[in-house]
Every structure is written in structure tokens, then in C-alpha cells.
Amino acid sequence: EIMQGAYFLTFNFAGLYGEDMWLAGDGREPVADTYRLRCINIIVDHPYHYHAFIQEQLEKRADRYMQICIDQLHMAYMHRYFTQVKLGPFLPTAGTEMLCKPWGERTTDILFTGTYVCPSHFDVFINRNGEEYSQFYHSIIDEVLSDPHALLEDVARRRLTEEIPEATEDELRETLGHIQFLDYYIRFTLRGNVVAALADAGLKVHIIGAGWENLPCSHPENLILSPYASSEECLLALADAKLALNVLPCFHAGAHDRVFNTMLAGAVCVTDSNPYLDQILIDEENVI
């Protein structure tokens, strides 16, 4: 039995945007609204991916909605652009401890878990408004790719205000809610470059995730592909790996759970870093 005013804990707005399995009552409204549930939503990616969903929470259930972020700069973004949203505490990602095989019994040398989309897939969005816009978007992409400390939202905002000095805060927020394709372009460029470099150096890379057959590299024969696996299967694969790769997808003050899942599985996590990881990981103790 669902009690009025109980809590509804979810991730990435699941159950809050009208999926059939979460509808209730004669009016077929979300169960969170039928029972006036207090919603706690943990978003596990950057808030600029969710502007429309965040705005919907403010319109429908502002007094019953709390959002939790897994990166401290994601929280700063919310404070700047969605001041009306009640935020919970910063919630770092964690890992899951599965079977931890002895090193000598592990059969996978290098593992990566994650999907790949060729960056050219996003050219349709970059080029849709002509050459001038394309150059503008690529200037943002190039700056973020050249500086590992650059925040996409900050670079985009600065470039926008350089081009349109009279842009209002509302207009800037609206525009930042449409930069997902830039995020994906950068994310998959970095991810693809890392995997391609290893494959082209002659190393076998086991990959769990869709799309890697489209990776441009000179030695695709070094990619051992498994297109899909459940979360549990990914954890078991980590427990069978000696080394697992991680490329932080636009996290600068938080971390992807791949880092901690790998460590708890007893494998070596090879990852880029950020100030948050530099703070919580101790050199020569759990990181080198």
C-alpha cells in the first residue's frame, strides 16, 4: 500500500515523465502525483541534459521535488540556472563489490565498459544552421578538447556572450539546455581516441558496449566486442579483468562509478583524473 506523502526515490526522472508502468488512477497520472509523493531524484549526468525535465518538476511538483547531483559542479550549475529547485547534498558515486578473482585466474587483460557513437553522427546538429554556426560549435569543441580542465558549459557561455553581449540570463540558460550534442561529440571523441590508441599499439581491448564496430582505427582486429551486457554482467567482467579503462565523461568534481567498481573488483583502473579524485584518492595507497 502506498501512503500519501511517502518518498519516491528515482534516478534520471524515471517514473516522473509519464511512462505507462508508473501511471495510476482514473486520470492515468504519475503515481508520484496520485499519492502526492515527495520525490527525490538523483541525476547521474550533467543537468544540461535535463533542462526540460527539471522545468517540468518546477511546474508540476516544485514543493515535493528534491534533486541530488553526483558532481559538485553539477550542483553549482543548478544553483546558477535553477535557483528554485531544492537540492539535496552532494552524493558521490560508489561501487559494488562482486566476486574478486585471484590475479592469476583473470582472463581479460584490458576491459572497457561503455558505448561508442562516432562523433560524425552529431554533424547533422553541428551543421544544420550553416557554416557560421558550424565554425562556432567547433570552436567550443576544440577549446574543451584542448584543455582537460575546461567546462563545456563555461566555454559555451563565454563564447555565446562574446557573440551576443546582450544575451540575458534566461536566454543563456535556454541555450545551454541544447548543447547535449557538443557533450556527446567531446565524450565519444575522447573515449574513441583512448581505445583506438591501445588497439593501434597492438593491445587487445575487450569492450562491453554497443557501437564500437564503427570506431575508426588501424587495427580493429584488436577490439574484442561484446555489444550488450547487464549491469551485473559488467561487474562480473570487471572481476575477471586485470585492467579496466575509464574516461571521465565531463565530470570535474565527481566521478563515474566505473572507477570505484573497478577498484572494488580488484582490477587496476586506468583513468584520467580531476580535483575531486585527487582529493579522495591517496598516492601510493590506492592510486599511483
Predicted ranges, named:
Residues R36-P165:
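Catalytic core of nucleotide-activated saccharide and alditol-phosphate transferases
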Residues L9, I40, M66-I68, P89-L91, ...:
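Hydrophobic/aromatic beta-strand patches that form the interior of the parallel beta-sheet core
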Residues E1-T83, T96-C100, S226-P227, S231-E233, ...:
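Extended catalytic core of nucleotide-activated donor transferases of GT-like folds
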Residues M66, I70, L182-I186, L190, ...:
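Conserved aromatic-histidine-acidic binding/catalytic patches
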Residues G104-A239:
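Conserved catalytic-core segment of nucleotide-activated headgroup transferases in glycan assembly
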Residues E1, Q57-R61, V85, Y185, ...:
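Catalytic binding pocket for nucleotide-activated donors in carbohydrate/polymer assembly enzymes
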